[in-house]
């Protein structure tokens, strides 16, 4: 269940609840099954013109060290169906070691060091999006200053994707 409310033209907030059950999924802590039944979270966004400031917090029920939050800012008005639209953004992520992270487009563990410590992580991520043609989007991300929750340095990371809207 996901609900979002626009308070006015500039501010919105929302919440979500997902029943996960006993699905056998790979978690951010390296486990291949989960220790919880539900995931819940809240988000908020404020925008004025091309500026967007946002944040989100998510937690697994009944599991310690299982929250993840992020805050960020974005400048631009990227829309994949609008030719030459663009946006740039900066986000900060803080993920506890047992956070309910299923493989997403975000970096979710410290296994870039080829270890199995899975201590959670904290990192900054710089992103940019551009639509060179209608319904074609190019996105690039660079994560930096990443550390585990215990303060161990994690490699910087980057990725790019090309999206088509049909």
Mark where each language-model region is.
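Mobile, glycine-rich extracellular loop/lid and propeptide segments
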Residues: 1-3
């Amino acid at each position: 269940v996901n609900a979002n409310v626009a308070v006015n033209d500039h501010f919105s907030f929302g919440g979500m609840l997902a029943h996960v059950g006993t699905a056998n999924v790979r978690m951010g802590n390296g486990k291949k099954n989960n220790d919880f039944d539900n995931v819940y979270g809240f988000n908020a966004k404020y925008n004025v013109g091309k500026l967007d400031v946002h944040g989100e917090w998510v937690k697994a029920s009944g599991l310690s060290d299982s929250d993840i939050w992020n805050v960020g800012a974005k400048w631009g008005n990227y829309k994949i169906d609008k030719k030459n639209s663009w946006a740039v953004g900066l986000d900060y992520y803080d993920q506890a070691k047992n956070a309910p992270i299923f493989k997403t487009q975000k970096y979710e563990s410290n296994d870039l060091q080829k270890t199995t410590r899975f201590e959670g992580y904290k990192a900054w991520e710089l992103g940019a999006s551009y639509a060179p043609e209608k319904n074609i989007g190019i996105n690039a991300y660079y994560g930096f200053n990443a550390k585990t929750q215990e303060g161990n340095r994690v490699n910087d990371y980057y990725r790019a994707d090309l999206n088509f809207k049909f």
